[in-house]
């Protein structure tokens, strides 16, 4: 369940974004079978949810987004595992950088002060 919740949260958070990938229902099924178990949802319910993500991401397929997170184990899992799942399922490539908490804050401040888009999303727990 934890893996499923993390995957759903990551996919939802990353759909905001800003170049090379293809959405794939077969990939969604592979991830459901091999990584997103156990889950409180049945595999059919999970696939229905993944189909929604594939459809929602369709206009953005082939895009590439940059995400910054602080260095904690949850974010390492997101960076190492869920970014691959996200790209295979949605067609959106995620460049996920992990830095220390202070560096994340500094990056956010820099982006706000300069108006220069450094990252498309920030993940902070």
What does each of the following model-derived ranges do?
Residues 49-56, 73-93:
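Short, polar/charged alpha-helical segment
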Residues 23-67, 87-88:
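Immediate post-signal peptide segment of exported/extracytoplasmic ligand-binding proteins
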Residues 14, 37-40, 44, 95, ...:
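Short N-terminal micro-motifs specific to bacterial/archaeal maturation
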